[in-house]
Amino acid sequence: MKVAYHGHSVVTVDTGDHQLIFDPFITGNSLTDLKPEDVKADVILLTHGHNDHVGDTIEIAKRNNSLVVAPNELAVYLGWKGLNVHPMHIGGSHQFDFGKVKLTQAFHGSAYTEEDSQKIVYTGMPAGILLTVEGRTIFHAGDTGLFSDMKLIGELNHIDLAFLPIGDNFTMGPEDAKLAAEWLRAKQVVPVHYSTFPVIEQDPHAFADSLPGGVGKVLEVGESIEFK
């Protein structure tokens, strides 16, 4: 299984049999190495409804006939757009053919901005996503501030790899993310959601270096971690 980072909060998981993508914000993402038309994904996992996370979901899903797994209201909204969706909610889990998904809390907002009509569409509650595939557990925290129940998430799950936002302003900054990493007890922690825009400019290497030896891992855009 190969897990790769593609800028902002975009993460792909390739199991060989399945190709999954988290929060496919590609168009408008100056850091990514992906092009929407080249993405192959049979599963799209969304943490919340902000445009910089929903991103190119509709185009990718329609072209690949992808299953979109998302918090309930966001899934309903995307279902109205003609996508194949599986709605979930915080605390709920589901065993799919590609693996198990469970949603956790995230302290953030969730709304999709339709810029042409200047409408903001409520898309439910934001979430973190626990994905268990081939005996490994990946935690994508989505956009979130620090919250104490991260300790519980860490106690209940043996997390092999966690993706944590460090950009500050809209999410946790590096100091809070450092504490989140401690509470989650993940074997490896990769920083995400930084330096896409000036207001979230951060040094990911400084964050990784602040964690215990071997825990912090900066993935350059397009770089991957392989589990065997």
From Swiss-Prot:
Q: Which UniProt keywords apply?
A: Hydrolase
Q: Which GO molecular function annotations are given, in alphabetical order?
A: hydrolase activity
SUPFAM superfamilies linked: Metallo-hydrolase/oxidoreductase
- Record carries keyword Hydrolase: yes
Return the Pfam families for the record.
Lactamase_B_2
**By its UniProt entry, which SMART domains does this protein fall under?**
Lactamase_B
Q: Which PANTHER family match?
A: UPF0173 METAL-DEPENDENT HYDROLASE YTKL (PTHR39189:SF1)
- State the family named in the UniProt similarity comment for this chain: Belongs to the UPF0173 family.
State what protein this is by name. Answer: UPF0173 metal-dependent hydrolase BLi03080/BL00413
Recall the taxonomic lineage recorded for the source organism: Bacteria, Bacillati, Bacillota, Bacilli, Bacillales
